Amino acid sequence: MAKEGPRIIVKMESTAGTGFYYTTTKNRRNTQAKLELRKYDPVAKKHVVFKEKKV
């Protein structure tokens, strides 16, 4: 069974189109908007924006 609570697992997918993604958790109560983070994409070999997608 899934864990109950405010934290959910989200997939952060690269906007560079490489298909690379990170997984992280976010608190649904504090952060209701979709996440956008600038992280390193090892396939593109540079920092790009990662956007939240459904797992």
Curated annotation (Swiss-Prot):
It comes from Deinococcus geothermalis (strain DSM 11300 / CIP 105573 / AG-3a). GO terms for cellular component: cytosolic large ribosomal subunit. NCBIfam families: PRK00595.1, rpmG_bact. Keywords: Ribonucleoprotein, Ribosomal protein. Gene3D superfamilies: Ribosomal protein L33. It comes from the Bacteria. The gene is rpmG. Belongs to the bacterial ribosomal protein bL33 family. This is Large ribosomal subunit protein bL33. InterPro entries: Ribosomal_bL33, Ribosomal_bL33_CS, Ribosomal_bL33_sf, Ribosomal_zn-bd. Pfam families: Ribosomal_L33. One of its GO terms (molecular function) is structural constituent of ribosome. One of its GO terms (biological process) is translation.
